[in-house]
UniProtKB/Swiss-Prot annotation:
Consequence of changing residue 90 to S: In plasmid pCHL1
Name of the molecule in the record: Virulence plasmid ParA family protein pGP5-D
Function: Required for growth within mammalian cells.
Outcome recorded upon mutating residue 56 to D: In plasmid pCHL1
Protein backbone atom coordinates (compact mmCIF):
# COMPACT_ATOMS: atom_id res chain seq x y z
CA UNK A 1 0.00 0.00 0.00
CA UNK A 2 1.26 3.46 -0.94
CA UNK A 3 0.75 6.05 1.82
CA UNK A 4 0.69 9.64 0.55
CA UNK A 5 0.68 12.65 2.86
CA UNK A 6 -0.88 15.82 1.46
CA UNK A 7 0.43 18.83 3.38
CA UNK A 8 0.73 22.59 3.45
CA UNK A 9 1.74 25.01 6.16
CA UNK A 10 -0.95 27.60 5.50
CA UNK A 11 -4.64 27.37 4.77
CA UNK A 12 -6.27 27.94 1.41
CA UNK A 13 -3.85 25.94 -0.74
CA UNK A 14 -6.34 23.35 -2.01
CA UNK A 15 -4.78 20.60 0.11
CA UNK A 16 -8.01 18.98 1.27
CA UNK A 17 -9.69 19.43 -2.12
CA UNK A 18 -6.80 17.63 -3.81
CA UNK A 19 -6.72 14.89 -1.17
CA UNK A 20 -10.40 14.14 -1.74
CA UNK A 21 -10.43 14.40 -5.52
CA UNK A 22 -7.17 12.55 -6.21
CA UNK A 23 -8.33 9.79 -3.89
CA UNK A 24 -11.71 9.49 -5.59
CA UNK A 25 -10.07 9.56 -9.04
CA UNK A 26 -7.71 6.75 -8.11
CA UNK A 27 -10.73 4.63 -7.25
CA UNK A 28 -13.08 5.72 -10.04
CA UNK A 29 -10.68 5.93 -12.97
CA UNK A 30 -7.76 3.68 -12.01
CA UNK A 31 -9.72 0.97 -10.21
CA UNK A 32 -7.83 1.21 -6.93
CA UNK A 33 -9.03 0.55 -3.40
CA UNK A 34 -8.45 3.84 -1.56
CA UNK A 35 -8.38 4.80 2.12
CA UNK A 36 -8.70 8.51 2.90
CA UNK A 37 -7.50 9.53 6.37
CA UNK A 38 -8.57 12.88 7.86
CA UNK A 39 -6.02 14.19 10.34
CA UNK A 40 -7.13 17.84 10.07
CA UNK A 41 -9.24 18.99 13.07
CA UNK A 42 -11.33 21.10 10.69
CA UNK A 43 -12.76 17.80 9.35
CA UNK A 44 -13.21 19.22 5.85
CA UNK A 45 -12.19 15.99 4.16
CA UNK A 46 -14.73 14.06 6.20
CA UNK A 47 -17.42 16.64 5.46
CA UNK A 48 -16.57 16.66 1.76
CA UNK A 49 -17.36 12.96 1.64
CA UNK A 50 -20.65 13.42 3.46
CA UNK A 51 -19.39 11.99 6.76
CA UNK A 52 -20.98 13.51 9.85
CA UNK A 53 -18.37 13.79 12.61
CA UNK A 54 -19.94 13.38 16.06
CA UNK A 55 -18.47 14.82 19.27
CA UNK A 56 -17.64 11.28 20.42
CA UNK A 57 -16.41 10.13 17.01
CA UNK A 58 -13.23 8.10 17.10
CA UNK A 59 -10.77 9.09 14.43
CA UNK A 60 -7.11 9.43 13.54
CA UNK A 61 -6.39 11.24 16.79
CA UNK A 62 -7.33 8.08 18.66
CA UNK A 63 -4.92 6.00 16.60
CA UNK A 64 -2.06 8.43 17.19
CA UNK A 65 -2.51 8.76 20.95
CA UNK A 66 -3.70 5.29 21.96
CA UNK A 67 -2.58 1.80 21.10
CA UNK A 68 -6.02 0.20 21.09
CA UNK A 69 -7.44 -1.91 18.31
CA UNK A 70 -9.39 0.70 16.37
CA UNK A 71 -10.23 -1.14 13.16
CA UNK A 72 -13.87 -0.17 13.65
CA UNK A 73 -13.20 3.52 12.96
CA UNK A 74 -12.80 2.90 9.22
CA UNK A 75 -16.04 4.02 7.56
CA UNK A 76 -17.46 3.29 4.15
CA UNK A 77 -18.37 6.27 1.96
CA UNK A 78 -20.91 6.62 -0.82
CA UNK A 79 -18.00 6.43 -3.27
CA UNK A 80 -17.22 2.94 -4.54
CA UNK A 81 -13.83 1.64 -3.36
CA UNK A 82 -13.23 4.70 -1.14
CA UNK A 83 -13.20 4.31 2.65
CA UNK A 84 -12.55 6.95 5.29
CA UNK A 85 -10.88 7.29 8.66
CA UNK A 86 -12.74 10.39 9.87
CA UNK A 87 -11.39 13.29 11.86
CA UNK A 88 -12.04 13.48 15.59
CA UNK A 89 -13.04 16.52 17.58
CA UNK A 90 -10.39 15.51 20.10
CA UNK A 91 -7.65 16.20 17.58
CA UNK A 92 -8.31 19.94 17.90
CA UNK A 93 -6.84 19.78 21.40
CA UNK A 94 -3.57 18.48 19.96
CA UNK A 95 -3.32 20.69 16.90
CA UNK A 96 -0.20 22.44 18.15
CA UNK A 97 1.17 19.57 20.20
CA UNK A 98 4.85 19.87 21.07
CA UNK A 99 6.67 19.32 17.80
CA UNK A 100 9.75 18.09 19.68
CA UNK A 101 8.05 15.05 21.24
CA UNK A 102 8.95 11.70 19.79
CA UNK A 103 6.39 10.27 17.35
CA UNK A 104 4.27 7.43 18.70
CA UNK A 105 4.42 5.38 15.47
CA UNK A 106 0.87 4.25 16.27
CA UNK A 107 -0.49 5.64 13.01
CA UNK A 108 2.24 3.98 10.96
CA UNK A 109 1.73 0.66 12.75
CA UNK A 110 -2.05 0.85 12.36
CA UNK A 111 -1.83 1.51 8.62
CA UNK A 112 0.71 -1.24 8.07
CA UNK A 113 -1.08 -3.87 10.14
CA UNK A 114 -4.77 -3.22 9.54
CA UNK A 115 -4.97 -1.28 6.28
CA UNK A 116 -2.14 -2.31 3.97
CA UNK A 117 -3.60 -5.78 3.23
CA UNK A 118 -6.90 -4.29 2.04
CA UNK A 119 -6.04 -1.02 0.26
CA UNK A 120 -3.85 -0.01 -2.65
CA UNK A 121 -3.40 3.61 -1.56
CA UNK A 122 -3.88 5.63 1.61
CA UNK A 123 -4.05 9.44 1.44
CA UNK A 124 -3.59 11.39 4.68
CA UNK A 125 -4.93 14.95 4.84
CA UNK A 126 -2.94 16.89 7.44
CA UNK A 127 -3.54 20.09 9.43
CA UNK A 128 -2.08 23.29 7.91
CA UNK A 129 0.44 23.55 10.76
CA UNK A 130 3.71 22.21 12.15
CA UNK A 131 2.17 20.42 15.14
CA UNK A 132 2.49 16.90 16.43
CA UNK A 133 -0.31 15.51 14.27
CA UNK A 134 1.50 16.56 11.10
CA UNK A 135 4.67 15.00 12.43
CA UNK A 136 2.85 11.70 13.00
CA UNK A 137 1.60 11.81 9.39
CA UNK A 138 5.11 12.45 8.06
CA UNK A 139 6.42 9.44 9.96
CA UNK A 140 3.57 7.23 8.71
CA UNK A 141 3.74 8.30 5.07
CA UNK A 142 5.84 6.85 2.28
CA UNK A 143 5.73 10.00 0.19
CA UNK A 144 4.77 13.63 0.65
CA UNK A 145 2.82 15.90 -1.70
CA UNK A 146 3.21 19.59 -0.87
CA UNK A 147 0.21 21.71 -1.86
CA UNK A 148 0.92 25.33 -2.74
CA UNK A 149 -0.60 28.36 -4.43
CA UNK A 150 1.32 30.84 -6.63
CA UNK A 151 1.69 33.31 -3.76
CA UNK A 152 4.76 34.43 -1.78
CA UNK A 153 3.91 33.05 1.68
CA UNK A 154 2.74 29.74 0.27
CA UNK A 155 5.90 29.25 -1.79
CA UNK A 156 8.19 30.24 1.07
CA UNK A 157 6.56 27.56 3.21
CA UNK A 158 8.59 25.01 1.25
CA UNK A 159 11.58 25.89 3.41
CA UNK A 160 9.66 24.65 6.45
CA UNK A 161 9.15 21.28 4.82
CA UNK A 162 12.90 20.79 4.64
CA UNK A 163 13.26 21.52 8.35
CA UNK A 164 10.27 19.37 9.25
CA UNK A 165 11.48 16.35 7.29
CA UNK A 166 14.83 16.64 9.03
CA UNK A 167 13.05 16.53 12.41
CA UNK A 168 11.50 13.14 11.60
CA UNK A 169 14.68 11.74 10.07
CA UNK A 170 13.46 11.33 6.50
CA UNK A 171 15.64 12.23 3.48
CA UNK A 172 13.79 15.07 1.77
CA UNK A 173 14.71 14.17 -1.80
CA UNK A 174 13.40 10.63 -1.37
CA UNK A 175 10.34 11.53 0.71
CA UNK A 176 8.87 14.32 -1.43
CA UNK A 177 6.87 12.87 -4.32
CA UNK A 178 5.96 16.23 -5.80
CA UNK A 179 4.68 19.77 -5.41
CA UNK A 180 1.16 20.61 -6.57
CA UNK A 181 0.13 24.15 -7.51
CA UNK A 182 -3.55 25.11 -7.21
CA UNK A 183 -5.49 28.29 -8.05
CA UNK A 184 -3.36 28.59 -11.17
CA UNK A 185 -4.01 31.41 -13.64
CA UNK A 186 -2.18 31.13 -16.97
CA UNK A 187 -2.42 34.92 -17.40
CA UNK A 188 -0.46 35.72 -14.25
CA UNK A 189 2.79 37.47 -15.16
CA UNK A 190 4.54 36.20 -12.01
CA UNK A 191 4.03 32.50 -12.78
CA UNK A 192 7.56 31.87 -14.00
CA UNK A 193 9.04 33.65 -10.99
CA UNK A 194 7.22 31.29 -8.61
CA UNK A 195 8.21 28.26 -10.66
CA UNK A 196 11.85 29.36 -10.54
CA UNK A 197 11.68 29.75 -6.74
CA UNK A 198 10.19 26.28 -6.33
CA UNK A 199 12.84 24.78 -8.62
CA UNK A 200 15.58 26.48 -6.60
CA UNK A 201 14.32 24.79 -3.43
CA UNK A 202 13.26 21.39 -4.81
CA UNK A 203 14.56 20.76 -8.30
CA UNK A 204 12.36 18.66 -10.60
CA UNK A 205 9.70 18.12 -7.93
CA UNK A 206 6.99 20.40 -9.35
CA UNK A 207 4.17 18.45 -11.00
CA UNK A 208 3.70 19.47 -14.62
CA UNK A 209 -0.08 19.62 -14.10
CA UNK A 210 -1.35 22.85 -12.54
CA UNK A 211 -4.85 23.06 -11.04
CA UNK A 212 -6.58 26.08 -12.53
CA UNK A 213 -9.08 28.23 -10.66
CA UNK A 214 -12.56 26.78 -11.04
CA UNK A 215 -15.72 27.39 -9.02
CA UNK A 216 -16.71 23.79 -9.78
CA UNK A 217 -14.36 22.61 -7.05
CA UNK A 218 -16.15 24.39 -4.22
CA UNK A 219 -19.54 23.53 -5.69
CA UNK A 220 -18.68 19.84 -5.82
CA UNK A 221 -17.67 19.92 -2.15
CA UNK A 222 -21.09 21.33 -1.29
CA UNK A 223 -22.58 18.35 -3.12
CA UNK A 224 -20.31 16.04 -1.08
CA UNK A 225 -18.81 14.46 -4.17
CA UNK A 226 -15.74 14.61 -6.41
CA UNK A 227 -15.59 17.25 -9.12
CA UNK A 228 -15.08 14.54 -11.77
CA UNK A 229 -18.39 13.00 -10.78
CA UNK A 230 -20.44 16.19 -10.45
CA UNK A 231 -18.84 18.40 -13.11
CA UNK A 232 -17.02 15.96 -15.42
CA UNK A 233 -16.51 18.54 -18.19
CA UNK A 234 -15.04 21.23 -15.95
CA UNK A 235 -11.45 22.49 -16.06
CA UNK A 236 -10.94 21.28 -12.50
CA UNK A 237 -12.03 17.75 -13.36
CA UNK A 238 -9.63 17.72 -16.32
CA UNK A 239 -6.71 19.10 -14.33
CA UNK A 240 -7.07 16.86 -11.28
CA UNK A 241 -7.49 13.78 -13.45
CA UNK A 242 -4.22 14.64 -15.23
CA UNK A 243 -2.56 15.15 -11.85
CA UNK A 244 -3.91 11.80 -10.65
CA UNK A 245 -2.33 10.05 -13.62
CA UNK A 246 0.92 11.94 -13.09
CA UNK A 247 1.04 10.77 -9.47
CA UNK A 248 0.21 7.19 -10.48
CA UNK A 249 2.94 7.16 -13.12
CA UNK A 250 5.59 8.43 -10.71
CA UNK A 251 4.62 5.73 -8.22
CA UNK A 252 4.53 3.10 -11.00
CA UNK A 253 0.96 2.22 -10.07
CA UNK A 254 -0.47 -0.23 -12.56
CA UNK A 255 -4.08 0.01 -13.66
CA UNK A 256 -6.31 -1.70 -16.16
CA UNK A 257 -6.47 -0.29 -19.67
CA UNK A 258 -10.25 0.06 -19.44
CA UNK A 259 -9.85 2.52 -16.58
CA UNK A 260 -7.27 4.64 -18.37
CA UNK A 261 -9.56 4.95 -21.39
CA UNK A 262 -12.27 6.47 -19.19
CA UNK A 263 -10.13 9.55 -18.67
CA UNK A 264 -10.66 10.78 -22.22
Amino acid sequence: MHTLVFCSFKGGTGKTTLSLNVGCNLAQFLGKKVLLADLDPQSNLSSGLGASVRSNQKGLHDIVYTSNDLKSIICETKKDSVDLIPASFLSEQFRELDIHRGPSNNLKLFLNEYCAPFYDICIIDTPPSLGGLTKEAFVAGDKLIACLTPEPFSILGLQKIREFLSSVGKPEEEHILGIALSFWDDRNSTNQMYIDIIESIYKNKLFSTKIRRDISLSRSLLKEDSVANVYPNSRAAEDILKLTHEIANILHIEYERDYSQRTT
